[in-house]
């Protein structure tokens, strides 16, 4: 597959909470699609090592959700740090999209970008400054045409790769039902 500036990079991260000032990244996954949202490749799915102290001090929602999904234990056992995750992810991206070309794509992607700025600035720098945030469409549809939302539901597993797949499927749904494309 050739490098193409029209390809889109989808990233999702799972964190220990919502605040990059105190919380950290537990997992990162990446998918590249073409401009028509066809999946071209799934990148590395990396659990990032965090100490027992960090994992034991997550908020209750994170303890329950990441414990149930197995992510807490994967993070505990992982030998991957943030720098390794960045290097592996960029190595993958370089095969599909040039630096600075793709907006960062995902659901509530501004949150992921905040964590990238703090913990993974080299990765954040790989993206165009724009975002394709599926949650923006969801919020607009909720207000302007809420009946459309009845046709789409997400499992909400809160594992990074599954969340990206759901985000892509959700954008495909909106493309068909809102934009009629």
UniProtKB/Swiss-Prot annotation:
Species classification: Bacteria, Pseudomonadati, Pseudomonadota, Gammaproteobacteria, Alteromonadales
Domain Exonuclease: 8-171
Keyword field contains Transmembrane: no
PANTHER family: OLIGORIBONUCLEASE, MITOCHONDRIAL
Designated name of the protein: Oligoribonuclease
Entry annotation: catalytic residues: 129
InterPro entries reported for this sequence: Exonuclease_RNaseT/DNA_pol3 (IPR013520), Oligoribonuclease (IPR022894), RNaseH-like_sf (IPR012337), RNaseH_sf (IPR036397)
Compartments reported by the entry: Cytoplasm
GO CC term (a single one): cytoplasm
Pfam families recorded: RNase_T
Coiled-coil stretches: none
């Amino acid at each position: 597959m050739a490098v193409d500036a029209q390809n889109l990079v989808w990233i999702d991260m799972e964190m220990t909470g919502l605040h990059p000032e105190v919380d950290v990244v537990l997992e990162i996954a990446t998918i590249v699609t073409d401009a028509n949202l066809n999946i071209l490749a799934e990148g590395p799915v990396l659990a990032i090592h965090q100490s027992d102290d960090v994992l034991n001090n997550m908020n209750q929602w994170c303890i329950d959700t990441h414990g149930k999904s197995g992510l807490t234990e994967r993070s505990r056992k992982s030998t991957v740090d943030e720098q390794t995750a960045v290097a592996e992810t960029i190595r993958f991206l370089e095969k599909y999209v040039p630096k600075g070309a793709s907006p960062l794509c995902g659901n509530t992607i501004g949150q992921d970008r905040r964590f990238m700025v703090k913990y993974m600035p080299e990765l954040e720098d790989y993206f165009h400054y724009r975002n394709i945030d599926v949650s923006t469409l969801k919020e607009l549809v909720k207000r302007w045409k809420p009946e459309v939302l009845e046709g789409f539901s997400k499992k909400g597993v809160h594992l990074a790769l599954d969340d990206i797949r759901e985000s892509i499927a959700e954008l495909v749904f909106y493309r068909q039902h809102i934009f009629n494309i």
